[in-house]
UniProtKB/Swiss-Prot annotation:
<comment type="pathway">
    <text>Porphyrin-containing compound metabolism; protoporphyrin-IX biosynthesis; coproporphyrinogen-III from 5-aminolevulinate: step 2/4.</text>
</comment>
<dbReference type="GO" id="GO:0004418">
    <property type="term" value="F:hydroxymethylbilane synthase activity"/>
</dbReference>
<dbReference type="Pfam" id="PF01379">
    <property type="entry name" value="Porphobil_deam"/>
</dbReference>
<comment type="function">
    <text>Tetrapolymerization of the monopyrrole PBG into the hydroxymethylbilane pre-uroporphyrinogen in several discrete steps.</text>
</comment>
<dbReference type="GO" id="GO:0006782">
    <property type="term" value="P:protoporphyrinogen IX biosynthetic process"/>
</dbReference>
<comment type="similarity">
    <text>Belongs to the HMBS family.</text>
</comment>
<keyword id="KW-0808">Transferase</keyword>
<dbReference type="InterPro" id="IPR022417">
    <property type="entry name" value="Porphobilin_deaminase_N"/>
</dbReference>
<dbReference type="InterPro" id="IPR000860">
    <property type="entry name" value="HemC"/>
</dbReference>
<protein>
    <recommendedName>
        <fullName>Probable porphobilinogen deaminase</fullName>
        <ecNumber>2.5.1.61</ecNumber>
    </recommendedName>
</protein>
<keyword id="KW-0627">Porphyrin biosynthesis</keyword>
<dbReference type="GO" id="GO:0005737">
    <property type="term" value="C:cytoplasm"/>
</dbReference>
Length: 242
């Protein structure tokens, strides 16, 4: 079945390693890891395929003050990455699926299975030996997480938190917060070992832990390729963005 792609007039040069597959990504360590994760999965099926990760700073990276819950379902983190594909500088863009708006600038051609949908509460080490304070200072971003934290810790002081995973953990170390909410998938992808964590109960974001791949050209070829390689877990998920 995969032999057909070696004869595909568009895909064959990628599959045979004649030209690099150019992947667009945000500049954060997590985003770059996610792009390489996608590349490795394709290389499992096409060993000669190789690629380049081309990074871009997004509006969401530059603006560290706007609360994330106020820009949900926008292209805050995705539009600038998709523009690299639209302009022909990249072939595909790799996103955290939950960053996508309902109508992204590029076509969603694949959505991966979630490596872990759960949210976790990461707290200061001192709370291993003493109870949480009644006015627990918790950093989180989305409305969904805020609602969950409010139900679990009604007296908590919930504050917006922005930045990369590393930035957020640094704020916790600096005691700006008693605890912060994170996606366990992000922690796992970065290979971090955080001993002071609590797994939070559902509901979780339906796209948490998933990657979304977008493109603007040769859509049918890309969609078929990712389905054949079983990188797209469920084709029905693509209809959410169509």
């Amino acid at each position: 079945m995969l032999s057909a792609y070696y004869n595909d007039p568009f895909l064959s040069d990628f599959c045979l390693g004649k030209i690099p597959l150019r992947l667009a990504s945000r500049k954060s360590p997590l985003a770059v890891l996610q792009a390489h994760e996608c590349l490795r999965r394709l290389q499992t099926f096409f060993p000669r395929l190789w690629g380049q990760v081309i990074t871009e700073t997004t509006q969401g990276d530059l603006d560290q003050h706007t609360p994330l819950h106020s820009v949900e379902n926008t292209g805050f983190f995705t539009d600038d990455i998709d523009f690299l594909v639209q302009s022909g500088k990249c072939d595909l863009a790799i996103h955290s699926a939950k960053d996508l708006p309902e109508k992204p600038k590029a076509r969603v051609i694949a959505i991966t299975a979630s490596i872990d949908p759960r949210d976790i509460l990461v707290f200061q080490e001192k709370y291993l030996l003493q109870p949480f304070p009644s006015r627990l200072r918790i950093g989180c971003s989305s409305d969904r997480r805020r609602a969950l934290i409010s139900s679990l810790y009604p007296s908590a002081v919930i504050t917006d938190i922005r930045g990369t995973i590393q930035t957020r953990l640094a704020l916790l170390d600096q005691q700006k917060f008693d605890a912060i909410v994170m996606a366990n998938a992000a922690v796992s992808r970065l290979g971090l070992r955080l001993p002071c964590t609590v797994v939070l109960p559902p509901p979780y974001h339906p796209f948490q832990g998933r990657l979304a791949i977008t493109s603007c050209h040769h859509i049918a070829s890309w969609e078929k390729l990712f389905l054949t390689c079983k990188i797209t877990e469920n084709i029905n998920l693509l209809h959410f963005f169509s």
